[in-house]
Amino acid sequence: METKIVRKWAMPNKNTFSIKPVKDLICKYLKGKWIDPFANDSIFKDRLITNDINSAYNTNYNLDALKFLQQFDDDSVDGILFDPPYSIHQINEVYDGFGKIKQFSRYAHEIKRIIKPNGYCISFGWNTNGMPFEMKINGKKQKTGFYKEKKEILIVSHGGCHNDTLITVDQKYNSQLKNVILSEEIITEEELFNRYEEETL
């Protein structure tokens, strides 16, 4: 899969989803059951299952974001908008008194668990890393279920002293199909020959 990278210019807005190129990108993927664990005052709240730990926002749930994600069944959502306020390290300052941010890996683990095969995670951040291809879970390096190559990256420039808005679209692969692909990559000709020899003896 080749990553589609698009760069556009737009005026900044404190509500990221209201920036036209961002809004257009989200609308392109927003089909089926989508959730937003950090919804704040999202313009898409009528089209998503929303959560914000701050009860001042009119969302479906007011839970810790990790607990919100944990309540969904495996492979049960078509997509997730993942837009933590500012950086993952600054969230405590923004949500003063509302508890501690969990390690990113704990979010990523839940996100990969609940997204359906071929579903999407649209991430917002300081870089375009998005969802990791693999990470350590319980001390062991494991595949996360997302393709290594990003589906799409949108860079929205705002000019002046404003930082760009970076959006990454990751797609979860169909695990059965991916297992076949991985098997083909891993098995060498020598291993294949040895297996054939064992089966024919």
Predicted segments, located by residue:
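A short glycine-rich, Lys/Arg-flanked "PGG" loop and its adjoining helix->strand segment in the class I
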Residues: 98-117
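A short acidic, Gly/Pro-enriched loop at the edge of an enzyme's catalytic core
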Residues: 70-81, 88
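Class I S-adenosyl-L-methionine
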Residues: 127-199
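Short "lid" loop at the C-terminus of a central beta-strand within the Rossmann-like core
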Residues: 40, 86-87, 127-130
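S-adenosyl-L-methionine
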Residues: 1-46
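Conserved beta-strand signature within the Rossmann-like core of class I S-adenosyl-L-methionine
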Residues: 118-125
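SAM cofactor-binding core of SAM-dependent methyltransferases
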Residues: 30-69
